[in-house]
């Protein structure tokens, strides 16, 4: 059973990185600048998660219509990563996902993906309601329209979800410059 205490910092031993619906047809309708930022930050977060042995979960919203997971995500998933298909907007409703999380025994959900105001928002709120510590990586989520993105951030804060950026996640996971992975991971952003 995951600990009941609420941590205000991302904890490498208690985190699970969840990539929500970064799929071909959703990415294709994002502004170029936005999708480039998402690609860069996805690379940083997945590289760090893999090096630090943080479990990774990816979800796909109705892949028949929205396509598969983008290659820039798929190429970084490892043999321990799990992918779940869903039709519900909240990833929590994907068949088997909640059971998998219970097996992992992680209390913190670090969320990134598409779209900010729909699937990321509903996933974050439902996980918060279930008692998880939810951190949304604000520079690793996106919406087609800026107003949708901004409204999602406001709503997430109102719901008690922690907002942070990619660098914050990375350095909270590392906690100290003496961490054995510090030099390799710091190169990703410096």
Which residues does each predicted region cover?
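Active-site-adjacent betaalpha module
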Residues: 2-16, 64-190
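Short beta-strand segments at enzyme active-site cores
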Residues: 19-20, 55-61
């Amino acid at each position: 059973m995951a600990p009941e205490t609420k941590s205000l910092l991302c904890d490498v031993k208690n985190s699970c990185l969840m990539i929500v619906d970064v799929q071909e047809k959703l990415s294709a309708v994002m502004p170029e600048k936005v999708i480039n930022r998402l690609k860069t930050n996805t690379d940083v977060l997945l590289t760090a998660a893999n090096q630090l042995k943080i479990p990774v979960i990816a979800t796909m919203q109705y892949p028949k219509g929205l396509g598969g997971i983008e290659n820039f995500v798929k190429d970084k998933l490892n043999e321990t990563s799990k992918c779940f298909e869903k039709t519900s907007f909240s990833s929590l409703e994907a068949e088997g996902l909640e059971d998998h999380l219970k097996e992992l025994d992680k209390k913190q959900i670090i969320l990134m993906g598409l779209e900010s105001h729909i699937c990321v928002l509903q996933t974050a709120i439902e996980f918060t309601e279930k008692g998880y510590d939810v951190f949304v990586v604000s520079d690793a989520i996106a919406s087609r329209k800026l107003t949708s993105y901004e409204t999602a951030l406001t709503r997430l804060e109102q719901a008690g979800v922690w907002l942070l950026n990619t660098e914050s996640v990375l350095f909270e996971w590392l906690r100290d410059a003496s961490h054995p992975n510090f030099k390799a991971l710091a190169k990703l952003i410096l």
